[in-house]
């Protein structure tokens, strides 16, 4: 049995790298827009206000992403991973009412449901960046 193990053939997920890149691009885009459209001549004040606005907007987008992910299929995937830990540990406190084959079927269906989830995050980032640009111009 040990000789027939196969390596993990799942494709790598680059979602975290893409999301981090989007956040960095958003931060500098908002920063440049607020500097460009600012009406005062004091460069220190402009940079300080622009950095604060950019940081707060990106931080709010991160919070929004966390809320959305917890309320959708990623939250369900997290519950499945907790259940998987109980199966591996054989916990006497939490006896699962489901077999391991049923668990594998459920986890694969959750993976299929969450495959296109990054599009929803991307649309939220775009909407948030548009709102932040409008707010920073006021």
Swiss-Prot record:
Membrane-related topology note: Multi-pass membrane protein
Key word Membrane present: yes
Compartments, record wording: Cell membrane
Gene Ontology annotations for the cellular component aspect, listed alphabetically: plasma membrane
Entry's transmembrane regions: 17-37, 43-63, 117-137
UniProt KW keywords: Cell membrane, Membrane, Transmembrane, Transmembrane helix
UniProt keyword Nuclease, yes or no: no
Protein name: Uncharacterized protein MG076 homolog
Protein source organism: Mycoplasma pneumoniae (strain ATCC 29342 / M129 / Subtype 1) (Mycoplasmoides pneumoniae)
